[in-house]
Amino acid sequence: MEDKKEEGESEIQEHGPEHWFSKWERQCLAEAEQEDQPEEEAEQSQQKLWHLFQNSATAVAQLYKDRVCQQQGLSLWVPFQNAATAVTNLYKESVDAHQRSFDLGIQIGYQRRNKDVLAWVKKRRRTIRREDLISFLCGKVPPPRNSRAPPRLTVVSPNRATPTETGSSVETDLQPFREAIALHGLSGAMASISVRSSTPGSPTHVSGSSNTGRRRNGLHDVDLNTFISEEMALHLDNGGTRKRTSAQCGDVITDSPTHKRNRMI
């Protein structure tokens, strides 16, 4: 039992976040963490600039001193040449130091960025989503994850004819709506028919006013179904769809109480 517990604990430790990386990956992470910042190069550049500035200041001061304490027959060309050379060297070294500092700043920025990304990777799961990485690099919040894809809506301009597939899909979507209205109209019609077929002495016999009201309700339901069917047939551009719609309307009108009432009369 103890051996099994130890094996289970070892498996849990092996599958932990710190054991997601391979040996080579851990070695790369260790080298990145131990990489020193290039501060020594920056200090050397500053010391060199300071040394050249001292030489330039000394040469300019010597030039001024020789001009004030000029002796008979002493030329000022040599002190001036020394001062000009020192100032020129200072300018050149300043330009080079500026470029080195710029490159050094980019290098330090990359190192810090790499360390931030590596620290972020250690805290994440074994598999990192692309949007999570992009949002981290861009400094933005990742978009919310939708478990289901949003429905795609097809927008058709009124000037363009609707394709056949679109018409059939619309008819399929509205089919339950049409069936519900048709069943409601048929139930009203059957109720009025059952009332008329009952004998005056039967318990189901009602007065003429209530019978007329039920007839009107049945007629109203059938008329509504007919109206909706005709409107749908007009808005669907598919010829086959119109034929199916008109056929359904004919079936409903055949069973309507109006038709049966005329037949009985």
Curated annotation (Swiss-Prot):
Lineage of origin: Eukaryota, Metazoa, Chordata, Craniata, Vertebrata
Function field: Acts as a central player within a network of stress response pathways promoting cellular adaptability. Functions as a negative regulator of TP53/P53 in the cellular response to telomere erosion and probably also DNA damage.
Oligomeric and partner information: Oligomer.
InterPro entries, A to Z: HAPR1 (IPR040308), HAPSTR1-like (IPR029196)
Record has Repeat as a keyword: no
Chain spans, region Disordered: 1-22, 145-170, 195-218, 240-265
Name of this chain's protein: HUWE1-associated protein modifying stress responses
Entry GO terms, CC: cytoplasm; nucleus
Species the sequence originates in: Xenopus tropicalis (Western clawed frog)
Recorded family membership: Belongs to the HAPSTR1 family.
Cellular localization per UniProt: Nucleus; Cytoplasm
Gene: hapstr1
